[in-house]
Amino acid sequence: MQTDTSAGRAALAEQAVLTRSIRRIWALPGTRGGVISHPSRLSHRLFLAWHYWWQAHLLDCITDAQLRVPSPQRARLARRMARASLIRNGGRRTNRFYDDMAWWGLALQRAQDVFELPFNAASIIRACRGAIRAEGVVPWRIGDNFLNAPANGPVAIMLARAGYRDEAMRITDWIAENLMLGSGLVADGV
């Protein structure tokens, strides 16, 4: 395999992830999830802890790979990952953390477009829109008062992609007004 091109390096990285990290969730057929460490610990292989955002980024990488070199195996993997996340998350797409939900929503939006999955981000979008506070942003997690860029950045992108541009613009305006530092960097939160 050639590694002197970005496509070659991407293919090599994908093969390493597929070989080392992709497993059935709780030995259930039709499911796949990403083990979060290598070498992996038993608790990670058994998916006792669930790193929702990590799974979202993995699904996004699988979607990127499909755009690079389409494959029916990748489409099957994406469907199995989307199904597994629903099972592992107790039958819900939502959880307590808005950054997790937004990253999973973004990954599902892209995967839906590319793979035509029978899953979508509607419940995540509803949850995030319903959590927008008077300031125009969502908190880091349910019941929290911490307002941060890591949650609101991906929420804004997800809402914009879903056509909720007014909410997305209010969020980005709030980030610019409240978290933008003089250096041009964005602070974590307030």
Label every PLM stretch briefly.
Residues 118, 146, 165-168:
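Internal amphipathic alpha-helical segments of the cytochrome P450 catalytic fold
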Residues 7, 75, 99-101, 165:
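Short, structured helix-loop boundary elements
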